[in-house]
Amino acid sequence: MNKLSTKLVVAIGIGAALYGILGLWGFSIAPNTFIKPALAILTIFGALFGPVAGLLIGLIGHTVTDTIAGWGIWWGWVFSSGIIGFAMGLIQKRVGFSVKNGTYNKGDISYLAITGLIGIVIAIIFAGAFDIIVMGEPFDKIVIQVLGATIADVIVFLVLGLPITIGLAKSNKKHTHLKIEK
């Protein structure tokens, strides 16, 4: 098993803190369901540091949000944040892709978009099923939450997470071809 580097542990800590604190703010769209801009953190940190970082940032960060908010820890949704973070981080495993170095192509962006969207759908369905089966939540309520959360997360991913990640890669690309003049 690979050891986590100090840099990766620090990134996970910072990402989890940002995701956890920013997760306290959102716009209500359904019962106990919000558009939370914090989801963009999972996209950015996942693309920068990979699936393990995305997974841990989602798990730890969501636990922080639920703990601070005081409504109890909803483990299905905590795990769903981890799943989303993991899916967002899969892009980092593609050969030639690097936000840090500004190296990417259209295929990489498509891959991030597809894995991100699939990850969101799988994660939210998991959270809903967990709430019904384990937490005993009413089916009708969960259907509304799952639909609302899926729409909200897709919007945040497409409007904030994906464009910010592409923007970071583009800004780093500009600096990769600088030459020192003598």
Swiss-Prot record:
It comes from the Bacteria. The keyword Ribonucleoprotein does not apply. Gene3D superfamilies: 1.10.1760.20. InterPro entries: ECF_substrate-spec-like, UPF0397. The chain crosses the membrane at residues 9-29, 40-60, 71-91, 114-134, 142-162. The keyword Transmembrane helix applies. GO terms for cellular component: plasma membrane. This is UPF0397 protein BCE_2667.
